[in-house]
UniProtKB/Swiss-Prot annotation:
GO terms for biological process: cell division; regulation of DNA-templated transcription. InterPro entries: Arc_rbn_hlx_hlx, MatP, MatP_C, MatP_N, MatP_N_sf. This is Macrodomain Ter protein. Pfam families: MatP, MatP_C. Homodimer. It is found in: Cytoplasm. GO terms for cellular component: cytoplasm. The gene is matP. The lineage of its organism: Bacteria, Pseudomonadati, Pseudomonadota, Gammaproteobacteria, Pasteurellales. Required for spatial organization of the terminus region of the chromosome (Ter macrodomain) during the cell cycle. Prevents early segregation of duplicated Ter macrodomains during cell division. Binds specifically to matS, which is a 13 bp signature motif repeated within the Ter macrodomain.
Amino acid sequence: MKYQKLENQEANWKWIYLIRKHREGENITRYEERSLQEAKAQELLESQNYPSQIEEWIKNHLSPALPIKLDQAIRARRKRFFNGEKQHTKKKSIDLEYAVWLRLSKYSRKMKMTLSETITYMIDERESKAQFENQMAAMKTSLKNLLK
């Protein structure tokens, strides 16, 4: 296993996941009866700060349809949690209009680079162009002063 398991943290993540599913209207329990579902969900809700109770609840009452989804969600959360600790593995997101993303994507493929590398390349090119323009402006100014 690549990432260390943190029992208390993961119990909290499971609690958050299950409560969110419950609030979305999904049955998180193995029971068909609505009143029993609500009672067990309330029991889970009250055990928020007790990781051992959360794990016990999951073992005894979790819907048979959820263990795989729950494990996948926790595995993804664990990965994001540990990758978020280091600056170079921390992921950031930006909102792009579709047309902009499409142009960037085509340019990336043309340059045989990732999107991140392409953006960095474009920024570097723009910075060097600005530096060149500043040097040219300074040279023009000094030439004008020289010719006066």
